[in-house]
Every structure is written in C-alpha cells, then in structure tokens.
Amino acid sequence: LYMYLKKKGYNDNELRETGLFTYDEKRGVTDKFWNRVMFPIMDANNRVIAFGGRVMGDAKPKYLNSPETKVFDKSRNLYGLNVARSSRKDYFLICEGYMDVISLHQAGFNNAVAALGTAFTQRHATLIKRYVKEVVLTFDSDEAGIKAALRAIPYLRDAGLAIKVLNMKPYKDPDEFIKALGREAYEERIKNATNFFI
C-alpha cells in the first residue's frame, strides 16, 4: 500500500497523517494493517473516515483501529451508524463489535451499531439520541460484556433513552446467536428483552 501511494504522488508527511502506516528506525515504514481483514469505518454521511482490522491467526492485538485523526474521533462515531440512521426501526441494537453489526445487518437488523473498539461513552449516547428514543443492549454474554453493558447504561439513561437488555445466553454474541438460531429467534429475543430501570 505504501509503495502504491508513493507512486501516486503522496509524500511521507501526507501518508503519516493517514494512520495507515507505522514508522520506526529498525523496520522503516510498514503497513499497519498487514495480514488483517479490513473494515471501513464510515461516518453518518457514508464517508470512509478510518479503518478497523482483524488479524488472521493468533497475533495480538486481535482488532486494530486507525488512530484518531482530524476526521476520526472514536467517541463521536459508531460502527454501522451510516446504515442504522436510515432504519425504519424506532430503536438501535447496540453491540460490541464489527462482526456483530455485520451479522445483524445481513440478517435484516439494519438498526445495529457498535462503539469503535473503545468503551461506550456519553458522546455515543448523545449521538444515538439524535436518531432514536430507545436502545436494546446486545453486548456479549460473558463477564466482560456484562460489565460493558453496566457501564453503558448510566450514559444511555442520562441521555434520556429507554433501555432494554437482550438475553443472549447460551450464545456469546449476536453473530454466534444468529448463526446458530437465525433471524426469527433473534427477533423473538428482542421482543422479550428486559426493560432496564435504575
């Protein structure tokens, strides 16, 4: 990618600002997302503003996002918002990751969004409030997912959003659930999601 962009006339300073490369004295310039499946991160107006990458294999970190730039602020964007904002649903499904959003969109739940590899923030809740009045939390069913949901709830409540929590068990996440049981079963879980009051 680096050589391609250099041939297209971009200089090193311009390329450094993209966040697509790493620079060090020992190895020189390397592609930051080498050997990763790439997820374009788009703003609410369908403009690509960053990338996420999932490693193939066991290397760490498993997921890697573009660094924050003038156009990309993780706390001001949600993965999938460009699709969800046009949904006919009056609520958003909030999940943890790219694959969950993609799986839900493919199953017809185009109202799914996720925070971008960061903890859910008040800014995320305020952004969601622009589009809907209710959310259904579909975070992972493991301990980390439960803790993440409990941290998100006060922000959502403070933004004035109605909150429901979807029981994912015995599955770990929406992607796994839909692959195992399908769209109709997930729709039923949404209907039976628990209202959350604090």
Question: Across the structure, where does each feature detected by a protein language model lie?
Answer:
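Short gly/pro/ser/thr-enriched loop/turn and capping motifs at secondary-structure boundaries
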Residues: 119-121, 144-146, 171-173
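Flexible glycine/proline-rich, aromatic-decorated loop/lid segments
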Residues: 125-128, 154-156, 195
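Short glycine-centered, acidic/aromatic-flanked micro-motifs in structured strand/loop junctions
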Residues: 139-141
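C-terminal or mid-to-C-terminal helical accessory/interaction module adjacent to the motor/catalytic core
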Residues: 162-198
